[in-house]
Amino acid sequence: MAQGSHQIDFQVLHDLRQKFPEVPEVVVSRCMLQNNNNLDACCAVLSQESTRYLYGEGDLNFSDESGISGLRNHMTSLNLDLQSQNVYHHGREGSRVNGSRTLTHSVSDGQLQGGQSNNELFQQEPQTAPAQVPQGFNVFGMPSTSGASNSTPHLGFHLGSKGTSNLSQQTPRFNPIMVTLAPNIQTGRSTPTSLHIHGVPPPVLNSPQGNSIYIRPYITTPSGAARQTQQHSGWVSQFNPVNPQQAYQPSQPGPWTTYPASNPLPHTSTQQPNQQGHQTSHVYMPISSPTTPQPPTVHSSASSQSSAHSQYNIQNISTGPRKNQIEIKLEPPQRNSSSKLRSSGPRTASTSSLVNSQTLNRNQPTVYIAASPPSTDEMISRSQPKVYISANASTGDEQGMRNQPTLFISTNSGASAASRNMSGQVSMGPAFIHHHPPKSRVLGGNSAASPRVVVTQPNTKYTFKITVSPNKPPAVSPGVVSPTFELTNLLNHPDHYVETETIQHLTDPTLAHVDRVSEARKLSMGSDDAAYTQALLVHQKARMERLQRELEMQKKKLDKLKSEVNEMENSLTRRRLKRSNSMSQIPSLEEMQQLRSCNRQLQIDIDCLTKEIDLFQARGPHFNPSAIHNFYDNIGFVGPVPPKPKDQRSTIKAPKTQDTEDEEGAQWNCTACTFLNHPALIRCEQCEMPRHF
């Protein structure tokens, strides 16, 4: 790739890859070369490219091979419909499923190699396919690694087949697709929660494969012990069905050890009339790469079931720790017509999987898990467990079998979970899931619907569901944020897991005996599940009642608060009205002038009274201010005063008096009565008028 060029600044490349994870690394490298490692210029260009790659407008066709044509528009619409190999469907028809963003592509793990030959694409391996596999058909292929990053919530896929005109109907191309989950996923509301794959290839008549899903864990460390003949002991015809449990009992159970849900039978075929409800199969696969000594395989060996709860087997859920695992639950559709049941042969204990064995119809999915050594391409990503999901038309043609459209899911795990088992440690690599359409048997006009594959991750906050449905749009599965296994499907849909029909056994007494033992075991496990479910329901009902009581108390408190708020609002309204009324009583301008004149007059009166009080205090306590105004009323006779008779004594003393007056000063004249007073007097002798008024 462009990383090998000495002109690229790897620090800038790393920053741009972190900032624009949805843009392929080839585009980022080319942009850096064009802009001479200028970070700002590259950000400006990649911000435009990011929108294209986010919303399905970019070009992911990094290879000219026609087999990669299904990866256009960032795996928005993965049409692998094998009936229309000669027609190229546009890839954007499913780009807005559930309002989701599309999965973006990354070539960090290498370019997509769709042009490999059949010999390069499918490596030779031990017998890991069902017994009816045609000669030379290898169920599991080994595609080169490819990458995608930043899966977003509610990712919608339409799994149908895209082909080109140069491909024939009998030889569909093997289109590997890899979806990589970012290792730094943060917990939050925007955490990726679900992955939908819709559109299963239609059933093919007289197909020996049936509707099957194959899960194949790859071993990154080649080991002879890992390639034991015990891996494919379920497919050999020399298998002894009398004691089938020997293949499932490891000497030392580890975290990834699996126990069968029922007694497996090598290729039993039973009748189940009027089968209703859903049959489910569960596969738990590790998200983080576990370390197990030998990776044997487990096949969903299925015999008949009749328990009301046996079809929802959760008894193996608590077997060992399931941290960082993916659960793949297979729920076939409802089918009322009677059909034959096919059960696959038993396998050994799973390396990193937990399979609940189910009675599987030919029109219902089966799960197969096989182990195989890795290739040179897989040695690069040995710490990343991967899941390959492919849909095959099962036409019976060997070349058509080998060219299988495949979906490759890779989860980047930070640390690998260690587990102890019988021998050394082996890091588990990818696993394959091959989906094979069943034989189409139409009885009475009833046709089989498509199965649904749900992939979840228990004991974590992320849930990934893969739904396969060709006839209806994808359902919203937002994921379950819970640290424990969820029983919501069982509680919310109890009718889907009820089966009361009787089972017709084969004439072989040995097989019938093993079948009855399996049914008895499933009945006991189903009763345990029913008891646990009943206890859980009682607990949930008690919790619901307590929450209802708390809700009533909160409602009463809310009503009380509402009444108080209303009372306070009414009081505030009254105060505002009162204030507005007082503001309306402001006096006019004329009234203000009158009040001002009154205030001035009052101030004058106050000053006069103050002076009178001071005068009263100066004259003494006997001062009568009212007497000042009527002084002349009481003055008496105002005529001339007759002269007094002259006396000798008075004439002699007169000059002496004149001298005393000159010495004391001039007499002062009263302003009220004009009486001459002595200079020493401050008041008039006649009228008591002050000298200085």
From Swiss-Prot:
Full protein name: TGF-beta-activated kinase 1 and MAP3K7-binding protein 2
Membrane-protein topology: Peripheral membrane protein
Keyword Phosphoprotein: yes
Keyword Metal-binding: yes
SMART domains: CUE, ZnF_RBZ
Numbered residues of crosslink Glycyl lysine isopeptide (Lys-Gly) (interchain with G-Cter in ubiquitin): 611
ZnF RanBP2-type span: 663-693
